[in-house]
Amino acid sequence: MFHFFLKYHFFLFISMAPRYYLTLSQVCSQVWCNKYTIAFVLLAVKVYTFSLILRSTLDHLMDLVDTINVSLDQFASTATNFPAQLTQLTNKLIAEQLQQLKSNFKLSLLLLVSVIRALIGFYMEIFLGTFTCLLDAAAQASVNFALDSAQATLKCLNTTIVSVTSEVESGLESISSFIENSINTVSSLFTNGKKPSVTSINLSLGKLRNLQIPGSVTNELDSFRLNLDEFDNLKNSTINLLTAPLTHFDKNVSGSDLFGPIDSSKMVVANYGPSAAKNVTFDLTEVKNSIVDFKNDAAKIASIMIIVLASLSVIAMIALVFVERRNFVKRDIFVISVREKSSPLAIGNALETYQNRTIYYMAKLKVNPRYYWICNYLTSKYAMVVIIIGLVGVISFTLQYRLLLSVKNKLKNLIDTVSSPEQTKQLQASLSQYTAQTNNYIEAQSKALNQNLLGWYMKASTNVNDTLTDILHQINSTIHTVTGNTALSKPFEVVVYCVIGRKIVAVTKGITWLNEHLVIDLPQLPVDLFKDVTEAAPLRYGKQLETQMVKATNSLEHMLFIELYVALGFVGIWVIFIVMGIIFMFFPKKRTIGSPKLLTKTEKEEYIFPLSSFNTSSSVYSTLNDRPIS
């Protein structure tokens, strides 16, 4: 309470002193240095310096783009000349490899043909030769037995026939004499001694004396035995027919120019030179122009922010002029109110209303007076310094971060432009000529091998296949010729099909499968051979640019967030003031005071205290304990 008495005494004192307060014009001469204007000016300076840092970063990125452009041009030049240099180095190696491949393939084919030819003779000997041998043995044994039996039987039969014929003829002669005598006797009885008309009766075998079984039967058996040699002829002719195409193929392969030496200088790929490739240069001018546009946009945004902040500072100065003018009006009102008030508490409240604008406006708005104290506590000069610094820091962060984001989002699009520029596709198209020419040459070699080499094999295998098909017909025809319509014909044909025919059918199927699948397919270069190479360098440089960009933006972001954290720290202190104010408001410190000391005569005169006698007992002042203590 003594504090309020001092304030009251002070105002009384200055009322009798000469004027030393500033007039309105004098205050307005310094209003341009108000804290709001200074804050806005500092924000403008901060935005300007940050824009300079950002533009310097963009200049560094633009220099990096120039370096990347030069590196990409060197890469394009090297990549364009690489196929020609590679051709000169590898043509001889390719020719040697193709020559070795052809030689090895030729040797393999000759060995394969020799093996097939030997296997054909081996299988024909196994199947047809074995069957012929068995058939010949069986037939020879049967014919020899039949021939020997027929000769013995014919000899015996002919001897028996001759003996029987002689005996029959002798008996017939006796019978003939008897009959003739009988006829003569009877005839003389009936003819009166005349001579009979039948002179003689001759009973004989006549030509039957020479009756014998002809020897042609044994001749036919000999012919059957000799015809068995047809199976040997069939076997030999079959082997010759089957191996004839292979022999022809062997001669063609051995004498072909296809397997001759390859001249690497005459290879089609050797004609590929630097002039064959399209000259490709990387031009990142568009990227540089984009960065320049970003710089201009950043400068434009920074200029707008600075202009806005400068305008706000001017507005703050103008507003404060009106505020100061109102303060003088409020001062007059305060002086009048102080004259009318005698209570120190009322004088103190009037003084705070004059000094604190927040309470002044709350009073004008007729806000509940119970909230005046907490507003006064939170808007004191110490609390306002904290919250203003915090808010200025937050606003500064917002403006600078907005400026950084405007550039950062646009820079991300440049990474794709550098990582996969249009020139990469042109370079790939240029280098694909080398791949196409090389693949055409390899394909031509494959066609030559398939036509000139495997064409002979196809023809030979087709002839072998056709010959195998005719074998069964020849075997059946030979069996029919040998056995004729005998009972051995059908069994022999069945045995031949089971022993030989089924194998021949399997062989023909195998040859047909080989004809369909035997194709020389030399490996070719991948179509995208240079794709990874041409894309790797732009991707690497794009990654380098991205790394530098991210590093720069992250550094700026880190700096801005440090400012934000500091500003939020000041705001946090002001929040602590809020908590402390709530504690003070709802938990006031209670204390008990004693009776006030009596004023001396001099003090009474200074404070214009009434000097009349009055009760100064402590009971009079005991009611002060119930008054609010400031």
UniProtKB/Swiss-Prot annotation:
Query: What is this protein's record name?
Result: Plasma membrane fusion protein PRM1
- Which keywords does this chain's UniProt record carry? Cell membrane, Conjugation, Glycoprotein, Membrane, Transmembrane, Transmembrane helix
GO biological-process terms attached to the record: plasma membrane fusion involved in cytogamy
Give glycosylation sites per the record.
Answer: N158, N202, N236, N252, N279, N465, N476
What does the protein in this record do? Answer: Involved in cell fusion during mating by stabilizing the plasma membrane fusion event.
List the ranges whose topology is Extracellular: 1-37, 130-302, 398-566
What is the taxonomic lineage of the source species? Eukaryota, Fungi, Dikarya, Ascomycota, Saccharomycotina
State any GO CC term: mating projection tip
Subcellular location field: Cell membrane
Q: Which residues lie on this side of the membrane: Cytoplasmic?
A: 59-108, 324-376, 588-630
The record lists its disulfide bonds as none
What topology does the record note for this protein and the membrane?
Multi-pass membrane protein
Entry keyword annotation includes Iron-sulfur: no
Q: Where are the transmembrane segments?
A: 38-58, 109-129, 303-323, 377-397, 567-587
Q: Which family does it belong to?
A: Belongs to the PRM1 family.
Gene this chain is encoded by: PRM1
